[in-house]
Regions:
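Glycine-rich nucleophile elbow surrounding the catalytic serine of serine-hydrolase chemistry
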Residues: 224-234
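Short beta-strand/loop motif that positions the catalytic acidic residue
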Residues: 291, 298-300
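N-terminal targeting or regulatory segments adjacent to alpha/beta-hydrolase or S9 domains
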Residues: 1-73, 81, 116, 359-361
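Alpha/beta-hydrolase fold nucleophile elbow
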Residues: 214-226
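Mobile cap/lid helix-loop segments that gate and shape the active-site cleft of serine hydrolases
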Residues: 182, 186-190, 197, 204, ...
Length: 361
């Protein structure tokens, strides 16, 4: 039988990849001034994300619940994330006098939609099944430690918001894996993408956090694991409101991710991390390099089956060359851990040390 598709891939996928020359990458692009390149690269990134929600006219922050914790207070809040969306979130505020450094926490995907922000901040006054769901997830991927609470105990204001389709921003009828492709298709039909929408929400979340009177807007960072890691380095590229970013278990190249055997070829969840047209100009490490010379951290696992080590190493080399070109090698941290797709406590401690170095006075 004749065919031109095998698995989920066209048989000519290699030729398609060969035509991607990433002409806007630093060093390939015509710009020789790095700041001029950054402006053009970021503008192109924004063009690929058009038809985004307007910024909110006012945040309209309300605190709806509070819980005292050891060294900090957990607050359940609602605020206007954009002109279209009023969202619930968790905000952790350390005891003492601010202004404090602050971190936007970006949750993972995991094809697990019942919780979002609760994957990173311990929920409170919730149904027992939500508490159990969160505890089990944190045990499975975060070494039984809520990363947000860990950072708050160490003096950081922490904000965690659900991405669209997760937690309290979910689907009325209940979310499932297959819903993603239809939701993503509908975004595409309206000239934008689900991924772009998530990124703009993250930008607005950061701007909101930086606006709070007890936050030092010069010391705002972002952190995520898995899809949250992708969101984190994208956020570092998209906005100067982020002063430092850390990304755990999401960095690679199109060469190694677009293969017949890599998880990304399944579609579905991949739509949440897709900005159409962007690959014609920039590969993943090129986009991440828009953040240079800001302090930026990447951790990956040698045993992580989702991200081939050769692709991680290629991406690291690319970014290292960019930071080095700007005399900022000391501001880029790249490390492959002897670990699976997992954010262990030692890694969390290393991320805290990174933020302490760059975001604390």
């Amino acid at each position: 039988t004749a065919y031109e598709v095998t698995g989920n891939m066209p048989v000519f996928y290699r030729q398609m990849k060969q035509q991607l020359t990433f002409p806007l990458a630093w060093g390939t692009a015509e710009e020789t001034d790095f700041d001029a390149w950054k402006v053009r690269a970021r503008n192109r990134l924004m063009e690929c994300m058009e038809n985004i929600p307007p910024a909110p006219e006012a945040y309209g922050l309300e605190v709806t619940d509070r819980e005292r914790r050891e060294g900090y207070e957990a607050r359940k809040i609602v605020f206007n994330l954009s002109g279209w969306c009023r969202v619930p979130a968790y905000l952790l505020v350390p005891d003492g006098q601010g202004p404090f450094p602050a971190i936007v926490l970006l949750h993972d995907h995991g094809a697990h939609f019942s919780i979002g922000k609760e994957k990173m901040v311990r929920p409170f006054h919730v149904a027992p099944e939500i508490m159990k769901d969160a505890d089990q997830w944190v045990d499975r991927y975060y070494d039984d430690q809520y990363t947000g609470d860990y950072l708050a105990r160490h003096g950081y204001v922490v904000l965690a918001v659900d991405a669209l389709l997760w937690g309290e921003r979910g689907r009325k009828e209940g979310a499932s894996y297959d819903v993603q492709q239809a939701l993503a298709s509908n975004f595409l039909q309206m000239g934008t993408s689900w991924g772009a929408f998530i990124h703009m929400d993250d930008v607005r979340s950061t701007e909101f956090l930086a606006s709070l009177p007890f936050v030092d807007k010069e010391r705002v960072g972002c952190l995520g694991f898995s899809m949250g890691a992708y969101r984190s380095w994208m956020l570092g590229a998209l906005t100067d409101a982020v002063r430092a970013s850390a990304s755990v278990c999401w960095m690679n190249t199109t060469e190694y991710l677009m293969t017949p055997t890599n998880n990304q070829n399944k579609g579905g969840s991949a739509y949440a991390m897709l900005v159409p047209g962007l690959r014609r100009y920039l590969d993943y490490p090129h986009v991440a390099s828009i953040a240079c010379p800001k302090p930026t951290l990447f951790f990956n696992g040698r045993k992580d089956k989702l991200f081939p080590v050769a692709g991680v190493e290629d991406a690291y080399r690319e970014m290292e060359s960019v930071w080095k070109s700007q005399g900022a090698s000391d501001r880029l941290v790249t490390r492959l851990w002897d670990e699976t797709h997992f954010f262990n406590r030692e890694m969390q401690q290393a991320v805290l040390a990174f933020f302490d170095r760059w975001l604390k006075p």
